[in-house]
């Protein structure tokens, strides 16, 4: 193996992969015993909260498409490189044996055609699994327009598949990527969803049925490139969760890197708070029982940057409050600002045996600086009397501190 040549390819293709936010760079130099190169190493988190290190690279940054927002676009004058199948396999196993990584995150520009590219991604995963007995995590990008046969094989070797929508609206995609259309991305999503269901049904009767994409599928939206409102983005995400059974939707604030009249100017920075608020709204849909239609409406198309989405929703719908915690159903307790999923379940358990008090809530981890205005308890709660007060918003602003409190907060460089 020509290590100097491989190192140069790794530098180019790891840098090209950094704009996919399905996992984040650790930025760790790893000095000392077992020192590793930081190029291509990123951290991601499993559903149970474990942090795993992944080799995150592109197979190639050559691409037949000329999407305005993409640094690998066909017309962009940048250094190009491409790994061979064996180079990616050897690189992955080399990092894995040294405990630098626990898995592989592999994407690619599209060269020649979709099947040609996807077939090589699958060959890498297959070779790792069958020839090298690689048991680590594998995340493959689904290439739009790839055949069903290749996608089926990909699902047998990858833990997760993802096809990035990038632009959440049809009009935005047509503006910035006229060579693509939404159905190119949704068709493979639908196929993977159906295969997941089919394999799960088969496993109920035939235990030897292999797993198909056990970690599910995901997608990513670029925020701020095409001028969509937060309402449009959230409703698009909600639709993908409902129709395609996605495990996650990721949101990436657009980082201006290319000069194009269709894009925001290079001096534009997407506020970090907007990206953060979208993740919080996504959390409400996934864990708190909110529908995408109710988080925002036509009168309120953007998320409130001063308050998290649940608190902002509560302020707009004060008729739902205060909530009597001693008797309210779990679904309503989950809508109280400052009460998380674990705390809500503890409240339901504890109230069967005793009267809930502020002291109990504090021990459960409830954020009382927000929750106290939206609840009633068996004991007196003078804060609940302020639910209809015009001053409530100001009081909450005084009591709420955010790490994004500076108005000029911008997105940090992923690899800076």
Where are these regions (language model features)?
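Flexible, acidic/Gly-rich N-terminal and inter-domain linker regions that tether
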Residues: 1-62, 367, 375-376, 383-405, ...
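Local cysteine-cluster metal-coordination motifs and their immediate loop/turn environment
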Residues: 61-73
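Core AdoMet radical
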Residues: 73-88, 96-121, 127-148, 155-204, ...
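Short, electropositive alpha-helical surface patch
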Residues: 118-126, 130, 155-164, 224-243, ...
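Conserved C-terminal portion of the radical SAM core fold
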Residues: 169, 184-261, 270-296
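Alpha-helical ds-nucleic-acid-binding substructure associated with the helix-hairpin-helix region
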Residues: 267-270, 284-323
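C-terminal extensions
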Residues: 303-332, 358-416
């Amino acid at each position: 193996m020509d290590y100097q040549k491989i190192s140069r390819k790794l530098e180019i293709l790891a840098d090209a992969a950094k704009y996919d936010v399905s996992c984040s760079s650790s930025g760790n130099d790893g000095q000392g015993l077992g020192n590793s190169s930081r190029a291509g190493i990123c951290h991601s988190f499993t559903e149970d909260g474990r942090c795993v290190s992944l080799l995150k690279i592109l197979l190639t940054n050559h691409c037949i498409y000329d999407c305005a927002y993409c640094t690998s676009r066909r017309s962009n004058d940048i250094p190009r490189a491409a790994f061979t199948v064996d180079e990616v396999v050897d690189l992955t196993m080399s990092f894995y044996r040294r405990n630098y990584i626990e898995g592989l995150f592999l994407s690619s520009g599209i060269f020649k055609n979709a099947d040609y590219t996807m077939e090589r991604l699958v060959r890498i995963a297959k070779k790792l699994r069958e020839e090298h007995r690689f048991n680590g995590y594998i995340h493959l990008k689904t290439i739009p327009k790839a055949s069903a046969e290749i996608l089926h094989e990909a699902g047998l070797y990858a833990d997760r598949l993802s096809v990035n929508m990038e632009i959440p609206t049809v009009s935005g995609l047509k503006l910035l990527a006229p060579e693509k259309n939404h159905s190119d991305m949704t068709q493979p999503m639908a196929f993977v969803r159906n295969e997941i269901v089919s394999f799960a049904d088969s496993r109920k009767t035939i235990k030897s049925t292999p797993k198909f994409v056990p970690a599910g599928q995901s997608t990513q939206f670029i925020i701020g490139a095409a001028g969509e409102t937060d309402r449009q983005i959230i409703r698009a995400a909600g639709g993908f969760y409902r129709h395609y059974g996605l495990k996650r939707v990721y949101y990436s604030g657009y980082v201006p890197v290319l000069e194009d009249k269709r894009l925001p100017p290079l001096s534009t920075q997407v506020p970090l708070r907007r990206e953060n608020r979208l993740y919080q709204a996504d959390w409400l849909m996934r864990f708190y029982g909110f529908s995408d239609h109710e988080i925002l409406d036509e009168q309120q198309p953007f998320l409130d940057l001063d308050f998290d989405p649940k608190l902002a929703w509560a302020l707009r719908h004060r008729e739902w409050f205060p909530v009597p915690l001693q008797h309210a159903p779990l679904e309503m307790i989950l809508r109280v600002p400052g009460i998380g999923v674990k705390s809500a379940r503890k409240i339901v358990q504890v109230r069967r045996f005793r009267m809930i008090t502020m002291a109990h809530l504090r021990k459960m981890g409830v954020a009382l600086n927000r929750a106290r205005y939206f609840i009633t308890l068996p004991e007196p709660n003078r804060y609940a009397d302020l639910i209809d007060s015009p001053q409530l918003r100001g009081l909450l602003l005084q009591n709420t501190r955010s790490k994004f409190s500076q108005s000029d907060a911008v997105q940090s460089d992923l690899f800076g």
